[in-house]
């Protein structure tokens, strides 16, 4: 299922306005990390490998809302860490809805049942629940047994209550195409409002460095997997152009300014994955980052992205 029509129209109008202004670089999705703390230690995550003094910090609701206004991206992805561990997450979500931004609240779902009826049911809010495979694979990736069952039950309950729900699915090296195929078939009856797919991006600080896809392997994997997606077999929330890109049938230049990252450390240079320093403001990020030095053709650190 593609994104809702109103969301597509708003984003399309935003992009058109930027082009009319002659704006070459502009944000589409604010990656907002109100905290780095988490209740899991996933094998592929480099975000929670921070010193305790950083893990104990939270962004305030005002800081989150000011950052959204400052960059003015139409979409906000609230990540972390586990956002539901933030003591004021509801206030943050409600504030972003008042700004009429489309929000993807990323969560491992361990705490989600405590927020049903508290998080607003709104066309501006999507619950993006991490599901990276069937039970054995998912629980291995998050390094804790029982998480898969909680996540699946949370999907079912959230849909019954009227929330918009998607899966955030990352495939790691070691997952076969057949396993991914079986997993995507499993998701169909859950009634998700779409499935988002990616390969595991390399975090230098992640505890497990052996299970990241390289660029070539990513393309081979998705070419075979998506070749099985006949007649809309799976409800994938991506444009055909992105799916062609995943398969290596199309190439794009890197546009890290399109997904600026704001956290307790500031505006991260250049993107969510690479940490080459921080700016104090969005304007400083845009003005002082050497954007041309990034991308898989220009920088070895970006080679497998």
Regions found by a protein language model. Give the residues of each.
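Short, P/G- and charge-enriched loop/turn segments at secondary-structure junctions
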Residues: 17-21, 245-250, 291-292
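Radical SAM enzyme [4Fe-4S]-AdoMet core and its adjacent flexible, acidic
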Residues: 57-60, 99, 128-132, 140-259, ...
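Generic structural signal for helix capping and beta-alpha/helix-loop junctions
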Residues: 52, 85, 113, 136, ...
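Processing junctions and N-termini across compartments
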Residues: 32, 36-39, 248, 296-299
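A broadly conserved sequence feature marking short terminus-proximal activation segments
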Residues: 1-15, 262-276
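Flexible mid-to-C-terminal extensions adjoining Fe-S/redox cofactors in radical SAM and related proteins
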Residues: 26, 251, 265-305
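Conserved alpha-helical substructure of the radical SAM core
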Residues: 2-118, 122-123
């Amino acid at each position: 299922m593609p994104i809702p029509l109103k969301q597509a129209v708003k984003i399309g109008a935003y992009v058109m306005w930027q082009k009319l202004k002659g704006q070459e670089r502009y944000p589409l999705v604010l990656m907002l990390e109100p905290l780095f703390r988490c209740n899991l230690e996933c094998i592929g995550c480099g975000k929670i490998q921070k010193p305790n003094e950083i893990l104990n910090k939270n962004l305030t609701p005002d800081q989150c809302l000011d950052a959204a206004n400052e960059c003015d991206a139409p979409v906000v992805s609230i990540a972390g860490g586990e956002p539901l561990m933030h003591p004021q997450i509801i206030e943050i979500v409600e504030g972003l809805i008042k700004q009429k931004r489309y929000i993807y609240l990323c969560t491992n779902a361990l705490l989600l049942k405590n927020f049903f009826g508290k998080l607003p049911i709104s066309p501006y809010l999507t619950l993006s629940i991490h599901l990276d495979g069937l039970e054995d694979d998912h629980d291995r990736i998050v390094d804790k047994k029982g998480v898969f069952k909680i996540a699946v039950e949370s999907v079912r309950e959230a849909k019954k209550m009227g929330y918009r729900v998607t899966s955030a699915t990352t495939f790691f090296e070691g997952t076969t195409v057949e396993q991914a195929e079986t997993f995507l078939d499993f998701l169909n009856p859950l009634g998700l409002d779409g499935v988002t797919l990616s390969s595991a991006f390399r975090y230098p600080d992640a505890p497990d460095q052996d299970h990241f896809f390289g660029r070539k392997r990513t393309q081979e994997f998705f070419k075979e997997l998506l070749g099985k997606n006949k007649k809309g077999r799976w409800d994938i929330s991506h444009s055909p152009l992105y799916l062609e890109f995943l398969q290596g049938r199309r190439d794009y230049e890197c546009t890290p300014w399109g997904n600026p990252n704001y956290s307790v450390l500031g505006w991260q240079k250049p993107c969510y994955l690479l940490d080459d320093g921080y700016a104090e403001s969005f304007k400083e990020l845009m003005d002082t980052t050497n954007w041309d030095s990034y991308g898989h053709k220009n920088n070895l650190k970006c080679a497998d992205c």
